[in-house]
């Protein structure tokens, strides 16, 4: 029976006209939650807008700022694939309804392996860091006066451990014979260099800014070497989790 339910659910996830996803206002990404029993890292998906609205209202009542995004059928594959770089492994369908069921992401779609990439190309992703950053910023930004609480310090330490293990994408423009790294100025006047956990996050940035940009891969430990003068640090995925990290430029 469970096997048939799962099969029917996956069929609906592939062929419904649309599904509705709970999105976090804190990260501009799907709201992620860790299942207390299975420890799956899940996103919440519904077949009807009404069911999604009910869950959104319940979360807002707990001071968790969320909204609903409609994902149309033609966007399904791109949406499901976009979950892999975030570290999410499970889709919780219909949470809080009689039809609630968990579907593993790898059961729903088959992702091409790294072996299928063109020669010389590598897949740059940081799912452990990205996922921890999503959890951290969901908690941090939901506060009226955002601060790192005692309960959040362990999560922050885990996040920074993953960050230091990572390899990232940086964007630059060619100026004459040199390279000009991108900088984003903040409202307070500080400037941060954008840093991307994966190519999808870089694409969001590129689509907004336009112009010709090139990319390079850089290990976390080498980032101080490429910091621009005047940069206060990096902003990770500025059109997503937008995590700002203070990093000092390496002295010449």
Segment roles from a protein language model:
Residues 1-252:
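An interfacial alpha-helical scaffold signature
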């Amino acid at each position: 029976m469970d096997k048939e339910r799962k099969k029917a659910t996956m069929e609906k996830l592939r062929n419904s006209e649309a599904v509705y996803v709970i999105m976090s206002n804190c990260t501009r990404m799907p709201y992620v939650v860790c299942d207390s029993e299975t420890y799956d890292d899940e996103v919440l998906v519904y077949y009807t807008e009404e069911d999604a609205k009910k869950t959104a209202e319940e979360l807002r009542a707990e001071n968790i700022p969320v909204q609903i995004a409609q994902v149309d059928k033609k966007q399904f594959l791109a949406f499901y694939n976009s979950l892999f770089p975030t570290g999410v492994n499970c889709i919780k369908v219909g949470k809080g309804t009689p039809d609630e069921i968990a579907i593993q992401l790898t059961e729903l779609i088959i992702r091409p392996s790294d072996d299928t990439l063109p020669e010389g190309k590598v897949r740059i992703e940081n799912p452990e860091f990205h996922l921890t950053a999503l959890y951290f910023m969901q908690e941090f930004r939901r506060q009226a006066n955002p601060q790192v609480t005692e309960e959040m310090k362990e999560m922050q330490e885990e996040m920074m451990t993953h960050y230091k293990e990572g390899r990232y994408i940086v964007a630059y423009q060619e100026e004459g014979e040199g390279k000009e790294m991108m900088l984003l100025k903040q409202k307070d006047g500080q400037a941060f260099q954008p840093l991307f956990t994966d190519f999808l996050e870089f694409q969001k940035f590129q689509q907004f800014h336009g112009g010709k940009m090139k990319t390079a891969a850089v290990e976390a430990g080498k980032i101080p070497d490429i910091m621009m003068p005047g940069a206060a640090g990096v902003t990770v995925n500025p059109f997503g989790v937008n995590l700002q990290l203070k990093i000092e430029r390496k002295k010449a």
